[in-house]
Design a protein with these regions (language model features):
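A short Gly-Trp-Pro
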Residues: 1-152
């Protein structure tokens, strides 16, 4: 399997907030839940889950928003939804794939909450779930992604 070509950088729409990823991702995913649809103003949100110790904000000072149980971070200038820190999962950060400077390689490996999604909006993800998989299942998914997931 090819190397990850790290580090990656990315930014918001206006360029005021920038991020850097220095460790390989754990997983790529599309979430079809109603919350992600509303937050992204799209059929689903596309994320790259990265280890928290391989993620940093290198410019700007993101603000919290979006409400709900997850902690969503936005650029304070253009309000681009940049990343999420799910509570209880302090080891990871869900980076919104489109904020990466080089993001066209991202293919969702997992899609979640398909029962809430548009019937026409399915992805090529090899693993699809009507809701959120149980926590025990994520270890198997991340191990599979490490060998089978798309690379830049």
């Amino acid at each position: 399997m090819e190397e990850w070509k790290l580090p990656w950088e990315g930014g918001c729409r206006c360029g005021a907030t920038r991020i850097r990823v220095t460790r390989p991702p754990l997983l790529t995913m599309a979430c079809h839940c109603a919350g992600c649809q509303r937050m992204s103003a799209s059929a689903y949100s596309l994320s790259v889950a990265v280890p928290a110790d391989g993620f940093e904000v290198i410019a700007g000072d993101p603000v919290l928003g979006g409400k709900g149980r997850d902690v969503h971070h936005f650029c304070p200038e253009c309000m681009t939804w940049m990343f999420t820190r799910p509570p209880g999962l302090d080891f990871l950060v869900n980076v919104r794939a489109p904020v990466l400077d080089d993001h066209l390689w991202v293919v969702p490996f997992v899609e979640t909450f398909t029962e809430e999604g548009f019937a026409w909006a399915r992805t090529p993800a090899p693993h699809s779930f009507a809701t959120m998989p149980e926590m025990e299942g994520w270890q198997t998914l991340t191990a599979a992604f490490a060998t089978e997931g798309a690379r830049p």
